[in-house]
Amino acid sequence: PLRNLHEKVGIAARDEWLYDHINYEQEDGTYRQQFANTMRQIEDLVDDVPIYIWYADNADEQIGVRFILYLLREKTNDMYIINSTEQYEKYCVNKEQPIDYTSQMDSEVLKVLFEKNKETGPLSNEKRIQLETEWQVLSESKDMLRIWLDNEIKGMPEHYFDSFIMQTIEKIHKEQGTTEFINTGFVIGELLEQLNASVNIFFLEYRIRHLIYSGQLELKGIPKSMRHYSVRLR
């Protein structure tokens, strides 16, 4: 959930939802601490330095750039945004695979792209206001899932991927010629290969657990992480 995430009440609501639904493979509280540290760093940015924000063509980073710009709305710094997906496709001729996330690029690639964008001007006030307003719209939504589709952030029902998960497990059963249990991590790997969208693996794992609890999938193991249990169709 993103509702009112720029306020303490929204942060608390998101923390509670993640704690109840998502199996992050890290210590409890790590995400909350990282988020709090990031918010503090944004707040402490001094006013006399330019700010560069990198983002790629996925829902996480497209939402993130709008969220950060909203948090920085009172700052007078020059703001620069760099779409790493567009720049990678434009300048990295020898690319071996598509880039879904900025974090997939190594430092040398980022350096090249930064140099290529040095002459680009800062965001205009109009563009900043537009992106800040888009964040406000997102923060008023009750959607639990958003995807990047047709160059837009689109809210989807929480069960959006459920039928695809079921179809993928059925496909694996047919390919293996058996209905034996399949490791959940393997299922998620297959899902990511077939999806034309960048999807958070922990959200997919949450939906698999939902399909177990609703009686559509059978479980073997303890679902404390995607590596620790297997599933099959009932």
Locations of regions flagged by a protein language model:
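A conserved mid-domain beta-alpha-beta active-site/ligand-binding segment of alpha/beta enzyme cores
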Residues: 97-182
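A structured, charge-rich N-terminal accessory region that forms the first stable segment of a protein
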Residues: 1-33
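A short, conserved structural fragment
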Residues: 212-223
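Long, hydrophobic/aromatic-enriched structural stretches that serve as scaffold segments
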Residues: 22-67
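Short amphipathic alpha-helical interaction segments
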Residues: 197-213
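Short, cationic-aromatic polyanion-contact patches
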Residues: 222-234
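A short alpha->loop->secondary-structure connector
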Residues: 67-81
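Short acidic, hydrophobic short linear motifs in intrinsically disordered regions
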Residues: 176-194
